[in-house]
Amino acid sequence: MARKSNKTAMAFAMQAQTDVFVIPSASLDLYPVSNLNFSIAGITVENPEYTGSIHKNGPDVVGKTISGSFNINMRPPGGDDVPVANAYIPGRVLKAAKFTETIVSAPIPAAAEAIGGAGNTTTAVTLGATAGTAVDLYKGMALLLPTIIGPARDKITAIRSYSAAKLAALMETLDLAASGTYQIPKQVSYQRSISESDAPLLSVSQWLDGMRYDLVNFRISGLRWVMPVSTRDGATTPTFEVTYTATINSYGDEATPAIPAKGATPSFKDGKLFVAGKAVGGSNLTVDFGLRTAYAPDPNYADGSGAGELVESTTTINMDRQAYLKAQFYTLAMAEGQAYYPVYAQWGYTGGKLVQVVVPDARFNYQSPTLGQDFITETGDMYVDVFDRNVCINFPYFLA
């Protein structure tokens, strides 16, 4: 019988040591993926030898390269409580792309406390007596402000920056100045790291209808977060788009394991999209991390190169956004001034099933108006410079 594409599965394990394959569990380490592409490409060298005729021998096959791509739905961990370290399997992919996993396993403080008495506006709030004083201690994290008007999910916001005076700048503009109490809710966060340490490798088992490939030194070579807005005219799921390179450790015939259902993925709607402190409309938001991978020459390896290493990353935001009047939202002036502006997206309804994308500081490139459809839109890039936690994704847990 013909082999079937839908009988495809991937299992992911963190790899502690280069070249040492860690066997992923065919049950515990599985996670559903889509749009898998898997390439085994030969490395060839032309044979220059004369043959005594007009005909030449074919190239010598001297090795192979393994690469591919796949998508993972931007599905939060779910459940009633934050997962333990390394339990959220898409988080392993994020860690392999140079993100740090941060788990807040208990609210800070344990009970909501009064906010500070000074500096509270629609864009900033002073945290209370028990809050820490280290600069940027809570940068990029979710924050619960119960006095925000609306359902429980709307009371969740995020912190753009944090000062030693406990002033938390917000990623959005509130309708009213912050008052009452605050709390940093339980959450699992993945924060972009600019440390000098190398991103970890993965070991991956990949099944293609009855055949398993074990991939060692699995290196994330490209990562995009694609967040289309779901509308009354059509819905599309937000995804992590991943490309990779690897080495085949082994392969053989083995039945594809069944992947447990993970539930629906929240759509990007009925949430928040703030750019430069303004709620804006649009159809798509994409964060491209611009990863570049290289391979050091090494004759100790079968293909003459060592394991892939991340050597460069340039982060760019692209969005298709409604165009506004100069008095409302003037991107031309913002591009000319080259100041930093926050970009913030949030969607989902309940604790454990809500997504926050937090970019504290980004610069505008010039944006182009687009006509021809029903509405005038603007498209263009924003650039994210090298700051620690310059991009974060949070999955907060809170009571509805």
Over which residues does each language-model region extend?
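Signature of extracytoplasmic/envelope-associated structural regions
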Residues: 1-400
